[in-house]
């Protein structure tokens, strides 16, 4: 069933998963809400997600790479002004991967990939 979900829908879900996990990470690290919100926005921008996808490329399984590519190849009618088309496609692939892993219930792998993509308290 999960393997039949298209890349756009996986990315839609993965966007929410990434947003929640980034917020969780930042809240647990402490800080003022206004600061946390600005940092969270930086993490979930297409440019930061594109860089995160590059960091993860060498550690993805074949299955994960296939899901990432399925998301990356989704057709977009518009690209945000703050990202290039290439960045946006990579970000969509990353979101699709996180959506897929969430549906599989593989929270351990999600956390592992998040730690590699966004190590420590580094901001993108």
Regions found by a protein language model. Give the residues of each.
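Double-stranded RNA-binding/processing signature
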Residues: 1-124
């Amino acid at each position: 069933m999960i393997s039949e979900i298209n890349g756009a829908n996986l990315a839609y879900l993965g966007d929410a998963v990434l947003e929640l996990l980034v917020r969780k990470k930042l809240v647990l690290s402490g800080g003022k809400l206004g600061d946390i919100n600005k940092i969270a926005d930086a993490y979930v921008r297409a440019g930061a997600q594109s860089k995160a996808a590059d960091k993860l490329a060498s550690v993805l399984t074949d299955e994960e790479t296939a899901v990432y590519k399925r998301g990356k190849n989704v057709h977009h009618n518009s690209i945000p002004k703050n990202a290039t088309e290439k960045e946006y496609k990579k970000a969509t692939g990353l979101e699709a991967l996180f959506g897929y892993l969430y549906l599989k219930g593989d929270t351990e792998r999600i956390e592992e990939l998040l730690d590699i993509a966004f190590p420590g308290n580094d901001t993108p």
